[in-house]
């Protein structure tokens, strides 16, 4: 039982005691009448103070959560610089006011863009704080972001050194060359991004374990080509968990294959509210057919 609950129980007993004394006293017993009224009024005052304190605490907590939500929203890209020859759609829905999903899109020199997506273990405020930490680490390394292995290595070692063992993150970092459609990526235990083109589906499988588990972990880079008309989907497991049922990835692949203008809405329409138990992040990148 919490401290506030114990206080309310004690106060309720005081009020009941005052009422009992009042009910049992002799009709003309003024001392007992005053005692009963004193106990009763004391109980009411204590209850009022306890409820007021609880209300203030709850109001402050709600205000803190709103402020944290607003801060986290500023950490996620609200507007992305135009990607020449590409279209990008983003969808983010935290389970609670704040969440442990992190995503970023960072423009780099020479027609390149860095995509980062991470899913922190846990939910709520603790996960959101670690997600903000990862965001700061990625942004601080934007000058060397073309070296994805260094990015993954640095963040992994940082988490191993400064976070508890139960706190870790799956992540994917991907570097896109706009002109060629070449995408180099490191996947640290994240749900495999899905590349769809000409009716074929390719999963960008994991190239290393999640970040923050083992210090000095070795990761690998792999490269794929996004051809004109191709679509690449980054997502956290909140998407597949939120779809539920058998083979949710297969249903996602079918939705990606829809017309480019409706692909994102087709994906999000698969979500079932009764399975919504996690943060959901989706990035859908499309290479336009007219740019080669």
Regions found by a protein language model. Name each.
Residues 54-57, 70-81, 91, 137-141, ...:
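Amphipathic alpha-helical regulatory segments at dimerization interfaces
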Residues 68-71, 125-205, 219, 275, ...:
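Catalytic core of PPM/PP2C metal-dependent serine/threonine phosphatase domains
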Residues 30-40, 96-172, 245-250:
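Primarily the active-site beta-strand->alpha-helix module of PP2C/PPM metal-dependent phosphatases
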Residues 32-101, 153, 192:
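Regulatory cytosolic signal-relay segments
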Residues 119, 190, 235-238, 279:
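DG-centered beta-turn motif at the end of beta-strands
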Residues 97, 166, 212-217, 265:
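Short gly/ser/thr-rich secondary-structure transition/capping motifs
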Residues 126-144, 226, 230-276, 288-292:
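Active-site-proximal, acidic helix/loop segment immediately C-terminal to a metal-coordinating Asp/Glu
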Residues 1-53:
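Alpha-helical transmembrane segments and their helix-membrane boundary motifs
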């Amino acid at each position: 039982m919490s401290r506030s609950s114990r206080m309310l129980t004690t106060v309720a007993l005081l009020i009941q005691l005052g009422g009992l004394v009042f009910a049992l006293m002799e009709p003309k017993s003024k001392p007992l009448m005053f005692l009963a009224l004193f106990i009763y009024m004391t109980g009411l005052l204590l209850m009022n103070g306890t409820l007021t304190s609880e209300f203030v605490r709850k109001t402050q907590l709600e205000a803190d959560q709103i402020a944290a939500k607003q801060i986290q929203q500023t950490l996620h890209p609200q507007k992305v610089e135009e990607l020449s020859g590409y279209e990008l759609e983003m969808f983010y829905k935290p389970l609670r006011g704040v969440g442990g999903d992190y995503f970023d899109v960072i423009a780099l020199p020479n027609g390149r863009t860095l995509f980062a997506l991470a899913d922190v273990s846990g939910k709520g405020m603790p996960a959101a704080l670690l997600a903000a930490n990862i965001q700061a680490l990625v942004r601080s390394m934007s000058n060397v972001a073309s070296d994805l292995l260094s990015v993954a290595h640095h963040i992994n070692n940082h988490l191993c050194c400064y976070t508890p063992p139960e706190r870790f993150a799956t992540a994917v970092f991907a570097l896109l060359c706009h002109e060629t459609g070449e995408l180099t990526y490191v996947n640290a235990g994240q749900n495999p991004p899905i590349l769809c083109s000409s009716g074929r589906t390719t999963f960008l499988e994991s190239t290393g374990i999640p970040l923050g588990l083992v210090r000095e972990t070795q990761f690998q880079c792999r490269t794929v080509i996004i051809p004109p008309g191709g679509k690449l989907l980054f997502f956290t497991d909140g998407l597949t968990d939120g779809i539920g049922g058998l083979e949710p990835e297969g249903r996602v692949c079918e939705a990606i294959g829809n017309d480019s203008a409706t692909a994102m809405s087709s994906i999000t329409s698969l979500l079932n509210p009764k399975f919504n138990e996690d943060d959901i992040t989706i990035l859908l990148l499309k290479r336009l057919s007219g740019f080669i």
